[in-house]
Amino acid sequence: MTVTTRFAPSPTGHLHVGNVRTALHNWLWARKHGGRFLLRIDDTDVERSKEDYVAGIRADLAWLGLDIDAEERQSARFALYEAEFEKLKAAGRVYACYETPDELEVRRKILLSRGLPPVYERKPADAPVPEGVAPHWRFRLDHDAPIEWTDLIRGPQHFEPTTMSDPVVRRADGSWLYLLPSVIDDIAMGISHVVRGEDHVSNTAAQVQMFAALGASPPAFAHEALLVGTEGKLSKRLGSLGMASLREQGIEPIALAALLARLGTSDPVEPVTDLAPLVASIDFARFGRAPARFDEAELALLNQKILHHIDHAAVADRLPAAIDEARWKAIRPNLTTVAEAADWLPVFDGPFVPTATEAADRPVLRAAAKAALDIDWSADPWHALTAAVKEATGAKGRALFLPLRRALTGRDHGPDMAELLPLIAKEAAIARLTSAGGS
């Protein structure tokens, strides 16, 4: 059996961190098992589906590095749904219903007021059919067939169909709801594993019987705990936190993937620089049922750690041309986003205005300007410079290093000066030291 997973978003909005996590886990599982990862655009809602959102979905997956093996569109498969629907109708597994939404709501409230579950009550076969009313269609659950499956995350699952309403699968206008087309496509596309949020568990219960009614075995299911915010609650922000927003914040795609791959497990989140370790470690048996906490502060910190190790080639297309590999390696330990690299261009190439210096520091700076004239800039100039200044002035520790850093970079903190100074032209460094030292 070829492991085949699918990510099936509706193109009615932008992706957010919750459904991106689902896409990632489907992709990781397929790649771990040498299988296929499909993108299925669930665009049965023709009115609300937009091509701009489809393009955005593709772009977001590409940004994350999640390559797809095939793309399908539900809107191109209506003929297949119609044919399978007719088979179910002939077998008595779908039936027409004529209640209005208001009538159904009244019935629901009555049942709840009696302390009863609001389960849809089937009408007798000989119930009169109202004239001029187009029916909607429900799937008839088999009340004599308990629904069971072993979830890869939640373990054994059991549902009694007598406690469930027959689900609506087709509206009165002929349009399709989610449940039945999804099952038909999963069968036709050979989906072996369905990985999705735990809010789909009740859908799965109904779909298990749909698979059987269509003569197919259901795939394996893995229902993930939903993402919550740092306070342990569902967050509107998480529902709207899209990839564009994260890109604007300077989040690296591998940082987001590294965090989302491990959320919900007890495994540590590690600052990996490619997807391979995440592929190797994906294991649904390690996922728990407790809500998975998504912390933007944790993501930002992870992003920073990853930047400290990421290769120049991985970010070169987003760097100023003047930030070559040597400069990148020097400054990356001090960056929180790639965009901050541009802030270091004046340090390397100017124009540069040194910070005001204190009188007590000027002897150190004048000695440094003089010593720099005779230093070989290609052979560890920082250690040669500090040694010469220390010998000439007796300065050491903070009194030696901080004035030099300020004069050369205009900052109190930053990269290792032993790595940074060789990347500043000798003439520029001498000019800065001379200016800061005064007369």
From Swiss-Prot:
Listed under GO biological process in this entry are:
glutamyl-tRNA aminoacylation
UniProt-recorded Gene Ontology molecular function terms = ATP binding; glutamate-tRNA ligase activity; tRNA binding
Coarse class of the protein's main subcellular location: cytoplasm
Respond yes or no to whether keyword ATP-binding is given for this record: yes
Q: Does the keyword Aminoacyl-tRNA synthetase apply?
A: yes
What Gene3D superfamilies would the database entry show? 1.10.10.350, HUPs
Q: Which SUPFAM superfamilies match?
A: An anticodon-binding domain of class I aminoacyl-tRNA synthetases, Nucleotidylyl transferase
The reaction(s) this protein catalyses: tRNA(Glu) + L-glutamate + ATP = L-glutamyl-tRNA(Glu) + AMP + diphosphate
The short motif 'KMSKS' region is annotated over 233-237
What InterPro entries is this protein classified in? aa-tRNA-synth_I_cd-bd, aa-tRNA-synth_I_codon-bd_sub2, aa-tRNA-synth_I_CS, aa_tRNA-synth_I_cd-bd_sf, Glu-tRNA-ligase_bac/mito, Glu/Gln-tRNA-synth, Glu/Gln-tRNA-synth_Ib_cat-dom, GluQ/Sye
Which UniProt keywords are given for this protein, alphabetically ordered?
Answer: Aminoacyl-tRNA synthetase, ATP-binding, Cytoplasm, Ligase, Nucleotide-binding, Protein biosynthesis
Q: Where in the cell is it found?
A: Cytoplasm
As annotated in the record, motif 'HIGH' region runs over 9-19
- What are the EC numbers? 6.1.1.17
Entry GO CC: cytoplasm
Binding residues for ATP, per the UniProt record?
K236
Free-text function comment from the UniProt entry? Catalyzes the attachment of glutamate to tRNA(Glu) in a two-step reaction: glutamate is first activated by ATP to form Glu-AMP and then transferred to the acceptor end of tRNA(Glu).
Q: Which family does it belong to?
A: Belongs to the class-I aminoacyl-tRNA synthetase family. Glutamate--tRNA ligase type 1 subfamily.
Q: Whom does it interact with, and what assembly results? A: Monomer.
**What is this protein called in UniProt?**
Glutamate--tRNA ligase 2
Q: Which organism is it from?
A: Sphingopyxis alaskensis (strain DSM 13593 / LMG 18877 / RB2256)
